[in-house]
């Protein structure tokens, strides 16, 4: 069902498409067919030859199918240019516009003035009829507010400013003086030069600046006042736009001031070139085909035909206006045709024909003219269109130019001053600065006065400078012949740029400080200092060739090689030493415990000597552990148990490894070469990832600081070190020496000098950011080439090498450092003094301990003697008491004995009774007696009567009358034989401390 409906509707859809497209197609055919088939081209020409050539050109055009479509015919309508502009206007209306001209080609006699072409332009422009001028070059025709439909196949005069820029770039002139009239064309050429130079110099290296602008009123009578200002200026290159009459006055007065001779450069426009007193050596411009009316007529006709052909193919062209009186006519096709004309770009008889937005001819060729003797004009160059590059190109044969003063060599273009203002800065070893003493009136022969720059203080002149750069300056001034005033940097800085926002400016402007700022602002002529060449500075000042090539390096304090008293401890870290000490005592304790609690630790052989070695105690265990560690002989106090001996073997192995490692590491540590630096260079990971205990810095605002800003890969490092940057290099170097700063990043020349002067400092790693030190000069300075050539000669002659040895490397100091570094790394007393001191400390400790022991022993002996004396006195006192008791007992026994003799008891019975009373058990054998001082004889006398017999026998009792037993006398003798001393009695104690005096 759906398919059937679609088949039924399809014819209706096709019909609708046809009905819609048909009107459009018809309109297109109408557009092409409704365009006029005939086109009238008007001509307002200056002479009959031009009129005839105009007619002939249009006739030939009709046969050129490249420019004329089929069924299109061109016709010419010409009138003669009248000197009266009002008549010209009426002629244009009556003879051209009434004939429906689509465009007008106009020319005039240049001597008759420019008002006639302006009249044609005003009249035609009112009706939007395009006008193509072939001779009018005044700047006024570029104003589209007035000449709304005017084009020209010749460039305006002020376009010669473009050629001036090309010539200045070719001759490398950087400062110029512009002389121009105060009329429209004069001001237009100045504006064109200033505007074009802003974009032109973005593509070239040499930038020309306008030092002075001299504007004069036309129809001069005298130019003397302006010449006075020009003579005081530095530039000697004059760009002049003036009429032929005014140029005669200027050249006349300039010749009187000797400003047209040697050393001066004049580049003038076409009008001035035709002055009858143009000096020899003047360079001027002359437009190619400037007076070829026929060529310009042909080019204008073909440009017009090309535009109409393209317009016919794209849109409908309405008929041109027919009546000047019809003010209501607004011919839009004329405006569109004017836009098509401006977009043309063809190759014609006068060269490449194209137009800018103002309808002015571009790509016009010029001849560079050199004025010779007798006003002869010689072509020495061309400024023409290069079809390969699609742009204009300057070609000048310098060898054919004769400059003012009949010179073949190109002038410098500026007045070269022979007395210069020089600036420097204190930077060792390149510039040393000292203040003069109160009694000094002049500097030393190798010094030069260097007051502070622009300082009115009287003390500012009391400085003298010497050093590498000062010696270079002295030799440089002799070589290229100049005098100078030397001054110090006012703020002590090389200078860096600050971005400032000028009033009314949309972009930030760089403003330089320090030495660079003085040079940029032209307050100084030259900088003689260790000034690093870098892109930021080279954009604003000029540099000579480097007088010293260098780079950036790192300064650090050399790792200490001095031997301390504990050098022998350095092979092991403090932690390891502590662990070893702890291990000794832990092992000793474990050995003691193993030997103490082992069941075999106190085992003795049954038949062993009673003096066999005792078991291991704690003191012996410590002694054993230390003895094994120190590899000393162990004669006693060894472990007895198996478990303790196993641990002892393990400890011996541990001690062997520790001692061997210590010995090897000691040899490597004290004898082998140690690294000279802590850092390996700029790529050291510790710098790239800066740690808290590692500080690095440079000088803020310096060339090194700019280098780190440029390098993206160093951005992280720069952010870290930026806060640590110093104001001067001197402060940073002092902090490196003191250990406050670990790494100072600066120019290699300065750091190598510091390292050669102080053996404690060393540069780390390879150079990076290689550059050089150069002499700084103003942009366009005439001294640049001379200074560069002189420096190159100094390099070739060896003078720069001599300065390096004299000021930077300090040969004798460096040699001493090398001797220090190359000393054989053998062990000496300073390396091992700590060991000897340790032995001395051990000896002193032993002597001290023995003294303490002796003193302590003497104290103990004295105390023991006092105790012995007291004990002896107490024993004597007790003995005396006991003797008295014994005497009493003896007397009692004697009395009893005597009584017994007289009684019925037998003597034997009495003796037995006495013995029983004294000895409850007579069979008990008395133990061994101890003798104490002074009682040996008493003991024998006392015990002799009571000596016991052999076991199993009765005691042997001696009678009083027995020999050897004297009969005691009453009151005089005590019977000592019957009573023992009290200390042999049961319960006796020897404590006599209470008797000690």
From Swiss-Prot:
Family annotation (Pfam families): ANF_receptor, CaM_bdg_C0, Lig_chan, Lig_chan-Glu_bd
Signal peptide location: 1-26
Keyword Nucleotide-binding: no
Extracellular topological segments: 27-573, 673-831
Residue numbers on the Cytoplasmic membrane side: 595-651, 853-997
One Gene Ontology term, aspect cellular component: postsynaptic density
Gene Ontology MF, one: NMDA glutamate receptor activity
Membrane topology label: Multi-pass membrane protein
Keyword annotations of the record: Calcium, Cell membrane, Disulfide bond, Glycoprotein, Ion channel, Ion transport, Ligand-gated ion channel, Magnesium, Membrane, Phosphoprotein, Postsynaptic cell membrane, Receptor, Signal, Synapse, Transmembrane, Transmembrane helix, Transport
Glycosylation sites: 258, 314, 345, 397, 454, 481, 501, 693
Subcellular location: Cell membrane; Postsynaptic cell membrane; Postsynaptic density
Ranges of biased composition (kind: Polar residues): 987-997
Cross-referenced InterPro entries: ANF_lig-bd_rcpt, CaM-bd_C0_NMDA_rcpt_NR1, Glu/Gly-bd, Iono_Glu_rcpt_met, Ionotropic_Glu_rcpt, Iontro_rcpt_C, NMDA1-like_ligand-bd, NMDA1-like_N
Known function: NMDA receptor subtype of glutamate-gated ion channels with high calcium permeability and voltage-dependent sensitivity to magnesium. Mediated by glycine. This protein plays a key role in synaptic plasticity, synaptogenesis, excitotoxicity, memory acquisition and learning. It mediates neuronal functions in glutamate neurotransmission. Is involved in the cell surface targeting of NMDA receptors. Plays a role in associative learning and in long-term memory consolidation.
Similarity comment: Belongs to the glutamate-gated ion channel (TC 1.A.10.1) family.
PANTHER family membership: IONOTROPIC GLUTAMATE RECEPTOR
Protein name: Glutamate [NMDA] receptor subunit 1
């Amino acid at each position: 069902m759906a398919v059937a409906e679609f088949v039924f509707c399809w014819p209706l859809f096709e019909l609708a498409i046809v009905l819609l497209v048909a009107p459009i197609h018809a309109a297109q055919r109408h557009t092409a067919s409704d365009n006029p088939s005939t086109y009238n081209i008007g001509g307002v020409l200056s002479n009959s030859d031009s009129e005839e050539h105009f007619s002939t050109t249009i006739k030939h055009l009709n046969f050129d199918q490249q420019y004329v479509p089929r069924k299109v015919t061109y016709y010419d309508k010409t009138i003669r240019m009248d000197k009266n502009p009002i008549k010209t206007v009426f002629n244009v209306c009556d003879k051209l516009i009434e004939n429906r001209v689509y465009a007008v080609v106009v020319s005039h006699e240049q001597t008759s003035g420019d008002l006639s072409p302006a009249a044609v332009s005003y009249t035609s422009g009112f009706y939007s009829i395009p006008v193509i001028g072939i001779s009018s070059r005044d700047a006024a025709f570029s104003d589209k507010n007035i000449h709304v439909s005017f084009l020209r196949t010749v460039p305006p005069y002020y376009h010669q400013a473009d050629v001036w820029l090309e010539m200045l770039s070719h001759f490398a002139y950087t400062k110029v003086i512009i002389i121009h009239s105060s009329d429209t064309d004069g001001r237009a050429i100045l504006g064109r030069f200033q505007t074009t130079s802003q974009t032109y110099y973005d593509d070239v290296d040499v930038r020309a600046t306008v030092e002075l602008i001299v504007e004069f009123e036309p129809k001069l009578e005298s130019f003397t006042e302006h010449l006075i200002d020009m003579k005081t200026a530095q530039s000697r290159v004059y760009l002049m736009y003036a009429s032929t009459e005014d140029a005669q006055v200027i050249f006349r007065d300039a010749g009187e001031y000797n400003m047209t001779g040697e050393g001066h450069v004049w580049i003038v426009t076409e009008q001035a070139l035709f002055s009858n007193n143009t000096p020899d050596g003047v360079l001027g411009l002359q437009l190619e085909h400037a007076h070829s009316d026929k060529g310009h007529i042909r080019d204008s006709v073909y440009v017009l035909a090309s535009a109409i052909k393209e317009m016919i193919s794209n849109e409908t062209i309405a008929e041109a206006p027919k009546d000047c009186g019809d003010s209501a006519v607004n011919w839009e096709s004329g405006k569109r045709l004017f836009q098509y004309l401006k977009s043309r770009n063809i190759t014609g008889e006068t060269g490449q024909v194209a137009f800018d937005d103002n309808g002015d001819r571009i790509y016009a060729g010029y001849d560079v003219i050199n004025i010779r003797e007798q006003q002869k004009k010689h072509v020495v160059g061309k400024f023409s269109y290069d079809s390969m590059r699609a742009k204009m190109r300057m070609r000048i044969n310098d060898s054919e130019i004769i400059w003012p003063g009949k010179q073949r060599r190109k002038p410098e273009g500026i007045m070269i001053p022979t007395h210069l203002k020089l600036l420097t800065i204190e930077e060792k070893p390149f510039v040393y600065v000292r203040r003069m003493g109160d009694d000094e009136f002049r500097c030393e022969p190798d010094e030069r006065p260097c007051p502070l720059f622009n300082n009115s203080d009287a003390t500012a002149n009391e400085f003298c400078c010497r050093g590498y750069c000062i010696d270079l300056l002295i030799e440089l001034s002799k070589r290229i012949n100049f005098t100078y005033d030397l001054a110090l940097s006012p703020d002590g800085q090389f200078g860096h740029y600050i971005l400032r926002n000028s009033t009314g400016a949309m972009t930030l402007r760089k403003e330089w400080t320090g030495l660079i700022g003085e040079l940029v602002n032209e307050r100084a002529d030259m900088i003689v200092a260790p000034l690093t060449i870098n892109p930021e500075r080279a954009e604003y000042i000029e540099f000579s060739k480097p007088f010293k090539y260098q780079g950036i390096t790192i300064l650090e304090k050399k790792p200490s090689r001095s031997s301390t008293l504990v050098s022998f401890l350095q092979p092991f870290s403090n932690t390891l030493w502590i662990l070893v000490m702890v291990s000794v005592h832990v092992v000793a304790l474990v050995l003691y415990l193993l030997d103490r609690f082992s069941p075999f630790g106190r085992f003795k052989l049954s038949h062993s000597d009673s003096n066999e070695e005792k078991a291991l105690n704690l003191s012996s265990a410590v002694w054993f552990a230390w003895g094994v560690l120190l590899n000393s002989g162990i004669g006693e106090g060894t472990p007895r148990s198996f478990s303790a001996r196993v641990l002892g073997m393990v400890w011996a192995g541990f001690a062997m490894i520790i001692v061997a490692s210590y010995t090897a590491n000691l040899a490597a540590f004290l004898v082998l070469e140690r690294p000279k630096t802590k850092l390996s260079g700029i790529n050291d990971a510790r710098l790239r990832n800066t740690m808290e205990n590692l500080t690095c810095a440079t000088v803020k605002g310096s060339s090194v600081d700019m280098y780190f800003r440029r390098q993206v890969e160093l951005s992280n490092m720069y952010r870290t070190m930026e806060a640590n940057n110093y104001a001067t290099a001197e402060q940073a170097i002092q902090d490196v020496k003191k250990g406050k700063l670990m790494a100072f990043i600066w120019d290699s020349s300065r750091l190598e000098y510091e390292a050669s002067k102080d053996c404690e400092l060393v540069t780390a790693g390879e150079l990076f950011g290689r550059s050089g030190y150069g002499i700084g000069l103003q942009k366009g300075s005439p001294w640049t080439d001379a200074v560069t050539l002189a420096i190159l000669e100094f390099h070739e002659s060896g003078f720069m090498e001599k300065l390096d040895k004299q000021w930077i490397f300090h040969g004798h100091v460096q040699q001493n450092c090398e001797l220090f570094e190359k000393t054989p790394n053998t062990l000496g007393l300073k390396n091992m003094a700590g060991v000897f001191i340790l032995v001395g400390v051990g000896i002193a400790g032993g002597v001290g301990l023995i003294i303490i022991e002796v003193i302590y022993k003497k104290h103990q002996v004295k105390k023991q003697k006092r105790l012995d004396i007291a004990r002896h006195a107490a024993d004597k006192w007790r003995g005396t008491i006991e003797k008295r008791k014994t005497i009493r007992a003896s007397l009692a026994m004697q009395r009893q004995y005597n009584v017994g003799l007289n009684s019925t008891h037998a003597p034997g019975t009495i003796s037995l009774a006495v013995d029983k009373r004294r000895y409850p058990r007579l069979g008990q054998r008395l133990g061994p007696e101890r003798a104490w001082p002074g009682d040996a004889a008493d003991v024998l006398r006392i015990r002799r009567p009571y000596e016991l017999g052999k076991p199993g026998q009765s005691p042997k009792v001696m009678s009083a009358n027995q020999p050897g037993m004297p009969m005691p006398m009453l009151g005089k003798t005590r019977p000592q034989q019957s009573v023992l001393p009290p200390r042999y009695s049961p319960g006796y104690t020897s404590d006599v401390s209470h008797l000690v005096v």
